[in-house]
Amino acid sequence: MHQVLQWLGGGFYLLNKIFLSFSEHARNRGDEAKARRWRIASWAVYIVGLPPWVIILVSWRNWIAASVEASGAPAMVLGLVIALRGTTKNPPRWLDHLALVCIPLGFGYSLYDFGGITTINQWLEIGLVLGFLVGTYLLAKERASGYLWYVLMHVTCGWLMWIQGYPWLFLQQLVSLVFIVDAYRMTQKRRVPR
């Protein structure tokens, strides 16, 4: 069962990063319509990949990461809504507020369950959480700095998956880094005058 969850969660999350990279390449070519389609696809597959990830994290008692991953759903939906609308103006505020409620709940439960921050896994989860929440929020708002936060997320999540015996998810994190760096590089090319 965990193998299937790895392939589903890891596969859809990897597609998200690939599609984000394709979107940035299309923007650099001046094809905003194609960039928007890739961005819509990227947020859609991200949402589909969420449940397998949450199940995996819960099964290892990674409460911080699991609750934050689940609380990232509103930011993912926000990204999809913004991509569908084609504008970052007037996003639904309730999505932001909903995500913020889930974060302290997961963190608090992890502290309760483990009696404080007592494991390397919890420290890795904190890095994963920061990268995921800040990165997803910034990318939903179409801000390039979100890619840098995703680097933190992928490094800490990859390490966590490695030590917990999920080689496919570890590999998926490494491959995702390639696409994240590429997407960020594309945003920087647009900023440099030719």
Language model features with spans:
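Alpha-helical membrane-protein topology signature
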Residues: 1-194
